[in-house]
Amino acid sequence: ADIDQEAADKSAKEHNVKVQTDDELMANKEIDLILNLTPPSSHKDIIVKSLMSEKHCFSEKPLAMNFEEALEIEKLSKEKGLKVGCAPDTFLGAAGQKSRELLENNSIGKIVLGTFNLMSHGMEDWHPNPDFFFKPGAGPVLDVGVYYITQLVNLLGPIKLINSVSSTAQEERTITSQPRYGEKIKVETPTTFIGSLEFYNDAKIQFFCSWDVWKHKHTTIELYGLEGSMIVPDPNFFSGNILMSKKNEDWQTISNDKMLLGIPNKDDNGSMFANYRGIGLADMI
């Protein structure tokens, strides 16, 4: 099913599967869980429809367009006694779990400071239909930054305080990917965020989240403890080498590609990597 029935019909024909309208899907008693992969502006509506139809729901991120909507979903979920889950689930991968194990074993001591950096020039250079990335409910934080924040919560616990400023560098963007090369996109959400996260364990993390950067040399996540430093691999993926240094020693490479949810299983132009998208849904049920 799809909120765009034409798209649902086309996909069903391509893959030779049954197609249903949204209402038919929600009324189907044989289905007890909905996977919600709609654009961000539709997430809350589909989740609420699922819950009202007595079905669990696992959604693409973000959970909702704002905090108030997320609280409404939480309240309804509890009232119905049903589960709601949300991406990203990459923190369940080998890289996230190994990083957490190292921190729990006090490998670099108490975490005092850190950084995370997500910077590129946006989505219009490669995505065939990039419009929704620049609408409310998307942008660099809600689309990709959530991978970094989720990983940090996995590693450091809950966040106590957030400080941030934002900006929009361009009012319009030009698509340079096919098939819509040359079309203009109206930018309706900030494309740069700079700020800090303060965790309940007193760790302070500085962050840059931007789609206004052509090139940079920053790493993804760095954590600085009283006994050493750690570089956590890209949280958009399930595995990757961890770099760790004890005090003033050289960097040590810690691999996790032999661990559960770290074994390479997907080919990308001849290069294998670990891709276990959907593990969050499996874990929820």
Q: What are the residue ranges of the model-derived segments?
A:
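Beta-loop-alpha module in the N-terminal Rossmann-like domain of NAD(P)-dependent dehydrogenases
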Residues: 3, 10, 15-76, 276-279
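Short alpha-helix immediately C-terminal to the canonical SAM-binding loop
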Residues: 8-9, 149
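A short helix->loop->beta-strand "cap" motif at the edges of active sites that frequently abuts
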Residues: 17, 53-55, 80-82, 200-204
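Hydrophobic residues in well-ordered beta-strands that form the structural core
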Residues: 21, 59, 65, 84-86, ...
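Rossmann-fold dehydrogenase core element
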Residues: 71-89, 108-116
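Predominantly a Rossmann-like dinucleotide-binding segment in NAD(P)-dependent oxidoreductases
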Residues: 90-186
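C-terminal glycine/acidic-rich active-site capping loop/insertion
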Residues: 171, 175-188, 194, 199, ...
